[in-house]
Amino acid sequence: MAARKTYILKLYVAGNTPNSMRALNTLREILENEFKGVYALKVIDVLKQPQLAEEDKILATPTLAKILPPPVRRIIGDLSDREKVLIGLDLLFDELTETEYSGDK
C-alpha cells in the first residue's frame, strides 16, 4: 500500500466572527473525518496578520488554501458543503482514485 499524502492547508479568517468560526469548525470536522493524521492546518487571522494575507494575495475571507500536495487550490466563502470543499481542493478525486485502485476488487 502506498503511503498517504500529507495535506498542508491554510484557512484565512477575519477575526472571531460567527462566519469565521463556522468555517473553522466545519473544516476541522471534514479534515478529522477524511484526513485524520495526514493534514496540517494553519489558521491565519488577516486582521492580526495582514502581511500574510497580502503576501498570499487573499482578497476575501474565509479563504481555504491547499498548499501541498500541488497544485495549490483555493476556496473562497462558504465551507459548509463537504463535497464542494473536497472537490474544490482537488481532494475528492484523490480519495476516489485511491479507492478505485486499492486492490479490493
Curated annotation (Swiss-Prot):
One of its GO terms (biological process) is circadian rhythm. InterPro entries: Circ_KaiB, KaiB-like, KaiB_domain, Thioredoxin-like_sf. Keywords: Biological rhythms. SMART domains: KaiB. SUPFAM superfamilies: Thioredoxin-like. Transmembrane segments: none annotated. PANTHER family: CIRCADIAN CLOCK PROTEIN KAIB2, KAIB-LIKE PROTEIN 1. May undergo a major conformational rearrangment; in the free state forms homooligomers. When bound to KaiC switches to a monomeric thioredoxin-fold (KaiB(fs)). The active oscillator complex is probably KaiC(6):KaiB(6). Belongs to the KaiB family. Component of the KaiBC clock protein complex, which constitutes the main circadian regulator in cyanobacteria; it may modify the ATPase activity of KaiC. May be a metamorphic protein which reversibly switches between an inactive tetrameric fold and a rare, thioredoxin-like monomeric fold (KaiB(fs)). KaiB(fs) binds phospho-KaiC, and perhaps clock output effectors. The kiaA gene has been eliminated from Prochlorococcus during genome streamlining. It has been suggested that the central oscillator in Prochlorococcus does not have to be as robust as in other cyanobacteria because the former live in specific niches of the Earth's oceans; they divide exactly once a day and at the same time. Thus gene loss and changes in kaiB function compared to other cyanobacteria, can occur. Has 2 forms, fold switches to a thioredoxin-like fold (KaiB(fs)) when bound to KaiC. This is Circadian clock oscillator protein KaiB. The gene is kaiB.
